[in-house]
Amino acid sequence: VCQKDLWTGSVGYGYDGTANEHHVSVVYDDWTRDGNYLFTSEAVEDGYIILGTETLIVNPAHLGTTGYSSTAILSMNDNGQGLLGIDGIFAGNDMDAGTCGPPASNLTCNKTPMFKLTDNYGQSWAGNHAAFDFYYVPDAVFDDIFESWPNNVVIDNCTGATEDLCGYWSWYEFDMRVDNEGNPHIVISLLAETQSSLLTISGKTGFYHLTIDRDMLGNDHDDNP
């Protein structure tokens, strides 16, 4: 029986010019055990990378219904500042049943980007302690975006039938990076959602770029991007 099945991976790399050291971090999705596992380099010499012991960096117990959260991705700069993130839902959110309870209901019941930050090449990670050590994009940010969206959309061009918008959906095509100052940058897709379908709205739905100064992040949800 296969006990480990490391599958989709993402690599973060940084070079410490002062110490002349290469730093490599890699995170994998595990299909056998679920969750995402992080490895950081203990040494990089002569083209060989010696990775340390795995760390469960994204615990599936902290996420909602299986299959609705992405695998983790990594980004690192040469200052040792990095980001590890997913686009997902918090535990308590049952997408199949259409219910949302604690802890998700105390955070967000929407699918949202969530991430952790490092300043030491992935040796340790920090986030919002109240959200399983993830910073996340709160509902208020999306509410600001949706203020310019229409309240209803045409769902049948032949009959002119309309439906009210009841929310949004984000597909699995997304990206997260840190810049040279270690500030997080997030690109996600947003589609309009009605009771019966997911729709595009010209000039409204599509890909959105979100960012925040890392120094503005705190341990409570009001300080998230």
Spans of features found by a protein language model:
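Extracellular, repeat-based ectodomains that mediate carbohydrate processing or recognition
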Residues: V1-P225
